[in-house]
Regions:
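Bacterial N-terminal signal peptides that target proteins for export
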Residues: 1-8
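Lipid interaction determinants
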Residues: 9-13, 18-159
């Protein structure tokens, strides 16, 4: 076998031995500021604002593959009772983990979350980028009233 063929074969074997790489995460890498948090119902497209019309938050995607999100609902105030403190949980979304991009989805393996049931799970989100806007869509899930809904969360690239 000629040296050139040997190197070509070695290169091919090396390439095939590499793990499958996910889509390029570069478009979502960075810091994004929350614009809106809506719940959309599948039947009829009705939308509501479970975090209020002016929630606050950020989502960060690092090039190393770590993401973090913190979202708080509109009108949160300092708690004065245990009941107040417990109520704040209903207006908080916070988690972090390792993410990968696969097509139009990012999938995060959570290692920390305000919701302990999410720790160790994979959370998949569909997304699209339009200019400086990032729109995140959760999977459709059945609400307590059995209607199917998802969160549609919009961010803009932070300056």
């Amino acid at each position: 076998m000629s040296m050139l063929k040997w190197f070509a074969a070695l290169a091919l074997v090396s390439l095939l031995a590499q793990p499958c790489l996910a889509a390029d995460p570069a478009p979502i890498v960075g810091v994004w500021k929350l614009v809106s948090f809506e719940r959309e119902y599948q039947a009829g497209g009705e939308r509501e604002y479970p975090m209020g019309k002016a929630p606050t938050g950020y989502i960060l995607f690092l090039p190393e593959g770590r993401m973090t999100v913190v979202i708080t609902g509109e009108g949160r105030t300092a708690p004065t009772t245990d009941q107040d403190r417990a109520g704040l949980y209903n207006t908080l979304v916070a988690y972090t983990g390792r993410y990968r991009v696969e097509g139009d989805k990012w999938i995060t393996t959570l290692d920390v979350s305000a919701n302990p049931a999410w720790v160790g799970t994979e959370q998949a989100r569909s997304f699209r980028i339009d200019g400086n806007r990032l729109q995140e869509m959760t999977a459709w899930v059945a609400r307590p009233d059995n209607r199917m809904a998802r969160a549609v969360i919009t961010y803009e690239r932070a300056k």
